[in-house]
Amino acid sequence: MFRFWYRYVFANRTLIETGAQQAVWERRIKPDYYSYMGLVFEKVCMDYLNAKNAKGELPILYTSIGRWWGTNAATHGQEEIDLIANDGKDYLFGECKWRNEKLDISVLKDLKAKADVFSMNRKNSYYVLFSKSGFTEAVLNEARSDDSILLVDLAELMNF
């Protein structure tokens, strides 16, 4: 709530106070809303992982969690991983998607490719995908056959 307030309301308070609420929505909030919600969703996903970690309900008991971005030495391109947690030897990599479409297998493949940056420092890898709108059948099938993949949809997030 504070993020929304300071990002949109505080920055536009004069316009709002003078009756331009609709214009503020149309020109200032609406064009940026999905970007904003993506960041909020990432925070909710991190809170979910922290709660599960505290209960020992994840495949690792991590000691640190955060976001990572940097240069992939293999591709020389910039990479970003929404959530990365580790316990010193095992890693959990997470991708958070606030989209209206189901999360596709390409997101999982991309996450695994980005996680290769950490291949020298890890013993085991786990992958968690968070999706507002669920998962395609290909992702569901992959998760059924691979215990290192965790899927969390909006319904699961609402119940934790």
Question: Where is each model-derived feature located?
Answer:
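Acidic/glycine-enriched edge-of-secondary-structure segments
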Residues: 65-74, 93-106
